[in-house]
From Swiss-Prot:
PROSITE patterns the UniProt entry points to: DOMON (PS50836)
The name this protein goes by in its record: DOMON domain-containing protein CBG21755
InterPro entries on file: DOMON_domain
Chief site of localization: secreted
Record keywords, A-Z: Glycoprotein, Secreted, Signal
The keyword Amino-acid biosynthesis is annotated on this UniProt entry: no
Length: 184
């Protein structure tokens, strides 16, 4: 039996491909993209309005809610110094900052209130809690809150969920395929 080509294309449009994955996020406040090279995860984060004495973060985990999340926290003090910390939320409305950050800052640019920063971390277990991003997990963008005497105050405004991010699927090879498909 010969299947009409239009039916074949229709069928294939409903089949999930193994390389389909979310590898970026953008809204009016922040944007980010991520890619894995070897066993290292690189995250490019941009905050469009990080003013003095403010912080923003990316949190990872499946909760429940805002508990049990790993965080990368970017802060700007009143001298325009950008600091990157890691931490976790053992319970809602509380973040515990790690003594030593387990991400490596690769690039920082601050132009006015526009922050662009690139960090790397192992894809697998890292930090004092051996938190791994090699499995699919929710990512949460927290646009920020006040920074007072080096302390992170409660965040203000909406938070943004990126559901079931499978960072391990965001490889350089996949990104090249996506880009080449956009060119054609």
């Amino acid at each position: 039996m010969i299947v009409p080509i239009s039916l074949l294309f229709l069928f294939l449009s409903f089949v999930p491909f193994s390389y389909s994955a979310t590898c970026d996020f953008e809204n009016e406040v922040a944007s980010m993209s991520w890619m894995v090279k070897g066993d290292v995860l690189q995250i490019n984060f941009e905050h469009k309005n990080l003013t003095e004495n403010r912080w923003a973060s990316i949190a990872f985990g499946n909760g429940p809610g805002m508990t049990n999340l790993e965080s990368i926290i970017f802060s700007r003090d009143d001298n325009n110094v950008i600091t990157t910390n890691t931490g976790f939320t053992p319970k809602k409305k509380k973040v515990v900052v790690d003594d030593v950050s387990y991400v490596t800052v690769r690039n920082v640019q601050l132009k006015g209130d526009l922050l662009r920063i690139t960090v790397t971390r192992p894809l697998g277990p890292a930090g004092p809690r051996d938190f791994s991003l090699d499995q699919c997990v929710n990512w949460i963008v927290v646009p920020g809150g006040a920074l007072s005497n080096g302390k992170f105050k409660k965040h203000h405004g909406q938070i943004y969920f990126v559901k079931d991010v499978c960072a391990a699927k965001c490889t350089a090879q996949r990104m090249m395929r996506v880009l080449s498909n956009r060119i054609h």
